[in-house]
């Protein structure tokens, strides 16, 4: 995490003050852009397939991916065929849009789409143009609904339902817009969101993250023997939650190593650990499997929404005509 990013979650500093003019400019541009779409001066793209956006108003580490995994399972259980679109941060394919398959790599598609594909084996289209992503899914798959992994601020794309994920621990940091703070939009934006969900905490409208058994980065086999000590490595927005989950399992962390979100690992990053145990997140694991050692493991986590979230979501699905009979 850079010094600027650290300042977002600390008392106002000189760095924050110096960045306020840029934050004001960011607000002006983003507000104008949203207004142009709201007034119809710029045209939205409306797909024939309903779109559910899972996003946030702040950058990094809010925990969208576990909720996307749960949402896919929930919709599938209702008999719907689900596709996913993603920007594919960290990926650099030769051509977009890209339809993810078993040959796709994190270098092409980004870490989160590869994680989602490994877990779900569902149609996933990746690329910077969300309209093209949607059209590719509609042309290649028989789908009933599309989940947009991120995209709340992509006002060119019409959507049926918006779900905003909020980190209960970090909330909105200093409450300022980028780059003076972590916000992509002001907190007033939450008033227009269909479903605001906290990741953790005590809010009735939340989900908790449930860690599963550690798995091998090399072959995805489940670890049966307990690990007592390990090095923790992560390239995610909020590594503290991950490290606390490991410690809660009784694992002593010999060292912790943080890289920027979506960092592309190489084998050289791990030479310092020799043959000692290394633990990482599932998002990190999909980038390290090609050069992993036997004693590298990742921690899968699953979202467990409250009844309040599930009931509100089901009502929205029914009201929007996505699903009948709930």
Swiss-Prot record:
Keywords associated with the record: ATP-binding, Kinase, Lipid A biosynthesis, Lipid biosynthesis, Lipid metabolism, Nucleotide-binding, Transferase
Query: Might you give the EC number(s) for this enzyme?
Result: 2.7.1.130
> Which GO molecular-function terms appear in the entry?
ATP binding; tetraacyldisaccharide 4'-kinase activity
* GO BP: any one term: lipid A biosynthetic process
Q: Name one GO cellular component term.
A: plasma membrane
User: Pathway of this protein?
Assistant: Glycolipid biosynthesis; lipid IV(A) biosynthesis; lipid IV(A) from (3R)-3-hydroxytetradecanoyl-[acyl-carrier-protein] and UDP-N-acetyl-alpha-D-glucosamine: step 6/6
| Reaction it catalyzes | a lipid A disaccharide + ATP = a lipid IVA + ADP + H(+)
User: Which top-level group of life is the source organism from?
Assistant: Bacteria
Residues given in the record as ATP binding sites: 58-65
| Role played | Transfers the gamma-phosphate of ATP to the 4'-position of a tetraacyldisaccharide 1-phosphate intermediate (termed DS-1-P) to form tetraacyldisaccharide 1,4'-bis-phosphate (lipid IVA).
Report the family membership: Belongs to the LpxK family.
In Swiss-Prot or TrEMBL terms, this protein is called Tetraacyldisaccharide 4'-kinase
Q: Which organism is it from?
A: Pseudoalteromonas translucida (strain TAC 125)
Q: Which taxonomic lineage does the organism of this UniProt entry have? A: Bacteria, Pseudomonadati, Pseudomonadota, Gammaproteobacteria, Alteromonadales
């Amino acid at each position: 995490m850079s010094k600027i990013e650290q300042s977002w979650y600390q008392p106002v500093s000189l760095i924050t003050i110096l960045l306020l003019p840029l934050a004001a400019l960011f607000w002006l541009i983003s507000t104008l852009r949203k207004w142009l779409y709201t007034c119809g001066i710029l045209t939205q793209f409306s797909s024939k397939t309903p779109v559910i956006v899972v996003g946030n108003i702040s950058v990094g580490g809010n925990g969208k991916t576990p909720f996307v995994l749960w949402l896919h399972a929930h919709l599938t259980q209702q008999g719907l065929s689900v596709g996913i679109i993603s920007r594919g941060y960290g990926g650099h394919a030769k051509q977009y849009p890209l339809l993810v398959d078993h040959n796709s790599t994190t270098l092409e598609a980004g870490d989160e789409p590869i994680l989602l594909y490994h877990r779900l084996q569902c149609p996933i289209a990746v690329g910077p143009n969300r309209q093209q992503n949607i059209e590719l899914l509609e042309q290649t798959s028989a789908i009933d609904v599309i989940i947009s992994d991120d995209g709340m601020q992509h006002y060119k794309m019409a959507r049926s339902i918006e779900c905003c994920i909020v980190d209960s621990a970090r909330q909105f940091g200093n409450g300022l817009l980028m780059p003076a703070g972590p916000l992509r939009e002001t907190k007033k934006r939450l008033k227009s969101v269909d479903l605001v969900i906290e990741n953790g905490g005590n809010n009735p409208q939340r989900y908790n993250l449930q860690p599963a058994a550690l798995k091998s980065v090399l072959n995805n086999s489940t670890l049966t023997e307990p690990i007592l000590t390990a090095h923790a490595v992560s390239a995610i927005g909020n590594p503290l939650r991950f490290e606390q989950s490991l410690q809660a399992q009784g694992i002593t962390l010999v060292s912790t190593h943080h890289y920027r979100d979506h960092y592309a690992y190489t084998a050289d990053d791990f030479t310092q650990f020799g043959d000692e145990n290394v633990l990482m997140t599932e998002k990190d694991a999909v980038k390290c499997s090609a050069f992993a050692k036997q004693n590298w493991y990742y921690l899968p986590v699953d979202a467990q929404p409250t009844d309040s979230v599930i009931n509100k979501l089901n009502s929205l699905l029914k009201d929007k005509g996505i699903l009948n009979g709930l």
